Amino acid sequence: MKLGILGAGMIVREFLPWLTGPESPFKVEALCSTERSAGAAQALCDQYGVPRHTTSYDELLSWVDVVYIAVPNILHVKYTRAALEAGRHVIVEKPMAPTAALAEELAELARSKKLFLFEAVTTQYQDNYAKIREVLPKVGAVTMVQCNFSQYSSRYHDFCAGKIWPSFDPACAGGALMDLGVYNVS
């Protein structure tokens, strides 16, 4: 399947080696970025053999079967909806949407068009989660679960200095619960 990527940030840089590698089920056809990120995006295309770069989302959608959406959280719904309406399968970074109602709306749109819609949360496939699923039936009734997920953010010093990145801003579908809290409940 021909895959298009929307975004050129950290998560895209982490996944591109696998997505363009020999084990990938996809052919990465194009990468779409903002004008501001065009230079970095083109460098990623050159480094990983992605044949096309564009700053037009409509153009990206015209070239691919599947789109991987890796942009700030607040933009997930907008670009997911546009891809589904264009008849494209979607893999969208977490959170898919800032509310359950919006996520269900996207899921219904995908169902109505017989398209796949995936949220790119992978923790549930890790070995420690498999072990929990194996042991849980032996434990009996679970009455409480307490989880702690801690991760240093490269943006922490900016946060302390008063600069609030979208990943920390609840108004942008960010903040502890939307950005990292999903790992505790997945």
Per-range role (PLM):
Residues 1-48:
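N-terminal Rossmann-like dinucleotide-binding module
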Residues 12, 69, 92-93, 117-119:
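Hydrophobic residues in well-ordered beta-strands that form the structural core
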Residues 31, 67, 145:
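Receiver (REC) domain switch-region micro-motif
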Residues 105-122, 143-144:
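Rossmann-fold dehydrogenase core element
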Residues 26-28, 64, 142:
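Core-facing hydrophobic residues within beta-strands of well-ordered domains
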Residues 123-186:
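Predominantly a Rossmann-like dinucleotide-binding segment in NAD(P)-dependent oxidoreductases
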